[in-house]
Amino acid sequence: MTSKTLPFHADTVGSYLRSQPLKEARAKFAAGELSREQLTEVEDQEIAKLVQAQLDAGIQVITDGEYRRAFWHIDFLENLNGIEGYHPEHGYKFNGVETKPYNTRCCGKVSWNPNHPFIEHFKKLKDIVGDRGIVKYTIPSPNQLMYPIQWDTGVYATRAEFAKDVQQAYKDAIKAFYDAGCRYLQFDDVYWGSLCNNHLKPEFEADKAQALENIQVVLAAKPADMVITTHVCRGNFRSTYLLTGAYDPIADALFGQTQYDGYFLEYDDERSGGFEPLKHFANNPHKGRVVLGLISSKFPELEDKTAIKARIEETTQYVPLEQLCLSPQCGFASTEEGNIMTEAQQWAKVRYVEEIAKEVWGED
């Protein structure tokens, strides 16, 4: 398995709608009616069902749906040494809706936690999947800690000093996942999306340079036989969004210089702009695959197949067809609440991605 074969031409971002038994178990756990051990047992059972559902849908790359998490990012970050979860006054404010108030902040010197629970979570998923598919594990990008609200708490004098420790923590994380058997890891990254949204601010160039440095330094530690991809997100909560903005302001750095093996890019509506920024991939010698998120994970309606194929064809002006892939635009449940659709509608979307990809590229 190399970066030439992954991502496949049909892939998914990673999160799935939480099953009803899982929702009920988490509610009982929060109310003190279930022990941690009992919740874990339900999680294990529901993840096993989810794995089978993915296989039944024809998916070759399998995730745990982020079933053990409340948020796509916080559960990982708060288990790093030097990072804590806390309850701010407000949650994340999306378009017309707000998340529950919970976030992370620096509380000490940052380092990798050798007892990080995600390593055990990965091992469990790997055991469930066995030889039936390829396991992908998703974690937040190191850039998710670069916001002032995260790092500027008095522990570090400068963001650059803080970033060095974050970079080392992520290099150690890559090694820990690799040693556990992980060969396909994904960094989910809203920070690049926020830069697209805030490119006129005076700190933009410094923020972009720091984001690029973080990724370059961390990916330099990647073993040759490990695939690391990224998903660039603009927010995904209850079928709403957080950010808007085309890729143009970040394309030279993200597309032209980073050494990811794949780039999951949102392209489901006008908020993401056009395909022209993809021309910067021609300057990137690594030739990571470009995964077009043309299928919405926010809404249940199936897109027009002819229109999707036409957009893929349009993209070949900038990226060769063989370097392109197709996926939903984001996960189906970046938080435990999930987007507003049924599980049946979710799987219809997933099967649709597989169907279109086979018609465009054939079998992987």
Q: Which role fits each region the language model picked out?
A:
Residues 1-364:
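Domain-level signal for soluble alpha/beta catalytic cores
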